UniProtKB/Swiss-Prot annotation:
Pfam families: Oxidored_q4
Localization: Mitochondrion membrane
Family: Belongs to the complex I subunit 3 family.
Reactions the enzyme catalyzes: a ubiquinone + NADH + 5 H(+)(in) = a ubiquinol + NAD(+) + 4 H(+)(out)
Keyword tRNA-binding part of the UniProt annotation: no
GO molecular function per UniProt: NADH dehydrogenase (ubiquinone) activity
Organism from which the protein derives: Dictyostelium citrinum
Primary location class: mitochondrion
Transmembrane segments: 10-30, 62-82, 89-109
The protein, known as: NADH-ubiquinone oxidoreductase chain 3
Lineage of origin: Eukaryota, Amoebozoa, Evosea, Eumycetozoa, Dictyostelia
Length: 120
């Protein structure tokens, strides 16, 4: 019985926040100014006039480099706790981290072999 009462409060809070979100969404939608002009639809390039079509296509290699950056940035996120607690680690912890680094190294070698980082 006690658990049900606690979940009831959470459920009430959820529905209140959901209702408030829906009300604010429709209130903003109906009260906004709907005037579109050319300057508003134009792409923004750091305060300069665009050098052509700002909504043009990008080469897929830019997305690939961005994804690779995210993967290796996430690797650093996983390696940081390892480096902070290196003095209190066990052999099991070292083996898990070694497996993690081996998998990342294999992935990096695969990327190089497939030419993912070759821009020529």
């Amino acid at each position: 019985m006690l658990v049900t009462v606690e979940f009831t409060y959470i459920l009430i809070l959820f529905f209140i926040s959901l209702g408030l979100s829906i009300i604010l969404f429709f209130l903003g939608y109906f009260l906004m100014f709907k005037v579109a002009y050319e300057d508003k639809l134009m792409g923004y390039e750091c305060g300069f006039d665009p050098f052509g079509n700002a909504r043009g296509e990008f080469d897929i290699r830019f997305y690939l480099v961005a994804i690779l950056f995210l993967i290796f940035d996430l690797e650093i996120t996983f390696l940081f706790p390892f480096s902070v607690s290196i003095m209190s680690m066990t052999l099991f912890s070292y083996s898990i981290m070694l497996i993690f680094l081996i998998i990342l190294t294999i992935g990096f070698i695969y990327e190089i072999k497939k030419g993912a980082l070759d821009w020529s």
